[in-house]
Amino acid sequence: MKLLSFKVNEQVKFGPKVKKEEAVWDVVEIQKQLNVLKDFPETIIDGITLGYDFVEQVRKLVDAAQKHEDGAQFKLAYSHIEWLSPIPRTPKNILCVGKNYNDHAVEMGAEKAPEDIMIFTKSPTAIAADEATLPVHAELTDSLDYEGELAIVIG
């Protein structure tokens, strides 16, 4: 299951990718209209804190939408949403490991990956969505090193 965060009609929502389609299930709307679950998290962060139970809740909502006579109403085409980063804002700093593979260390000017682990943090505001414009801050730096390697595995 690939969970996505997005904005539609100025509302931040989340849901899983629709299999074999360029669309996402609006699980927030499914729960709102079909009232499948007794309790459902309001944000993706709240859901992630539930662990595997959250994955099961999302599966139940998608199953209910697929069985509903007008279940297609809960699918939103990618062209109708504004992408957000998978986790729009983390509650704490993000721990990172720098130069953790040889090719990256070499492209940064080293001969090989360092022997000792290189840990640093990123602010919650450092997260950007796919295709988002990144601020350059030319008054502070003349180059950026950006990578897209954020993942959460539940289960």
Language model segments and positions:
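N-terminal non-catalytic cap/leader segment that marks the start of a structured domain
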Residues: M1-A113
